[in-house]
Amino acid sequence: MAEEMESSLEASFSSSGAVSGASGFLPPARSRIFKIIVIGDSNVGKTCLTYRFCAGRFPDRTEATIGVDFRERAVEIDGERIKIQLWDTAGQERFRKSMVQHYYRNVHAVVFVYDMTNMASFHSLPSWIEECKQHLLANDIPRILVGNKCDLRSAIQVPTDLAQKFADTHSMPLFETSAKNPNDNDHVEAIFMTLAHKLKSHKPLMLSQPPDNGIILKPEPKPAMTCWC
């Protein structure tokens, strides 16, 4: 696990390409890189969440992800520059088969996403957790549960207390947010910055033990959905 939790390193050059010091040129500063994968059914808003965090806005156009979508953003935490790489994979099985092994390689953290207006996407979460296990992701890799599209209040199907019980059962923090609503921009920021702080410090995201009366979900058939975000 120690090797898995070690971040990647990349050279970060100054505008002159190096830093001068008393003994001549010093080696270029290096930034840690953390790979975070974003998992969930198609149409739950994975791409829009990663775009909102990296670009600071909702994408002008949204289309179904085919294969893997990759974005990154540099942040500074306690004076250290860190790069966060967000890997968003297609939720549809036929688009995932050729990429799944590469997708799960050297992962530092996982974000599970469901659509708050679609109960089926919530019931699919156990299958996504199982996929992580099948690809040998250690249990102590940080995980976060995200309910997206909270702005569609009249259409919400997944109550917060149900999602919270599931999150507690799997020792994950729960965030409910909207990638589309600008008012929730700080909340989207908090999701990924929570992971960034955790990865930098290697401290647990949750210290409490999951309750004994946790719920267990079984996958249900996924209905057709029209929103590609």
UniProtKB/Swiss-Prot annotation:
Q: Where is this motif: Switch 1?
A: 56-68
| Record's catalysed reaction(s) | GTP + H2O = GDP + phosphate + H(+)
What is known about what this protein does? Answer: The small GTPases Rab are key regulators of intracellular membrane trafficking, from the formation of transport vesicles to their fusion with membranes. Rabs cycle between an inactive GDP-bound form and an active GTP-bound form that is able to recruit to membranes different sets of downstream effectors directly responsible for vesicle formation, movement, tethering and fusion. RAB33B acts, in coordination with RAB6A, to regulate intra-Golgi retrograde trafficking.
Origin: domain of life: Eukaryota
PANTHER family (alphabetical): PTHR47978
Subunit info here reads: Interacts (GTP- and GDP-bound forms) with ATG16L1; the complex consists of a tetramer where two RAB33B molecules bind independently one molecule of the ATG16L1 homodimer; the interaction promotes ATG12-ATG5-ATG16L1 complex recruitment to phagophores. Interacts with ATG16L2; however interaction is approximately hundred times lower than for ATG16L1. Interacts with RIC1 (via C-terminus domain); the interaction is direct with a preference for RAB33B-GTP. Interacts with RGP1.
**Localisation:** Golgi apparatus membrane; Golgi apparatus, cis-Golgi network; Preautophagosomal structure membrane
UniProt KW Membrane keyword: yes
Residue list for modification Cysteine methyl ester = C229
State whether keyword GTP-binding applies. yes
Family in the record? Belongs to the small GTPase superfamily. Rab family.
The protein, known as: Ras-related protein Rab-33B
In the record, what disease is this protein associated with? Smith-McCort dysplasia 2: A rare autosomal recessive osteochondrodysplasia with skeletal features identical to those of Dyggve-Melchior-Clausen syndrome, but with normal intelligence and no microcephaly. It is characterized by short limbs and trunk with barrel-shaped chest. The radiographic phenotype includes platyspondyly, generalized abnormalities of the epiphyses and metaphyses, and a distinctive lacy appearance of the iliac crest.
Question: Which enzyme class, named as a word?
Answer: hydrolase
Requisite cofactors: Mg(2+)
Posttranslational modification = Prenylated.
Q: What is known of its domains?
A: Switch 1, switch 2 and the interswitch regions are characteristic of Rab GTPases and mediate the interactions with Rab downstream effectors. The switch regions undergo conformational changes upon nucleotide binding which drive interaction with specific sets of effector proteins. Although most effectors only bind GTP-bound Rab, ATG16L1 effector binds both GTP- and GDP-bound RAB33B.
Entry's Gene Ontology cellular component terms: endosome; Golgi apparatus; Golgi lumen; Golgi membrane; phagophore assembly site membrane; presynapse
**Binding annotation for Mg(2+):** T47, T65, D88
Q: How does it sit in the membrane?
A: Lipid-anchor
One Gene Ontology term of the biological-process aspect is: skeletal system morphogenesis
Q: Where does GTP bind?
A: N43, V44, G45, K46, T47, C48, T62, T65, G91, N148, K149, D151, A179, K180
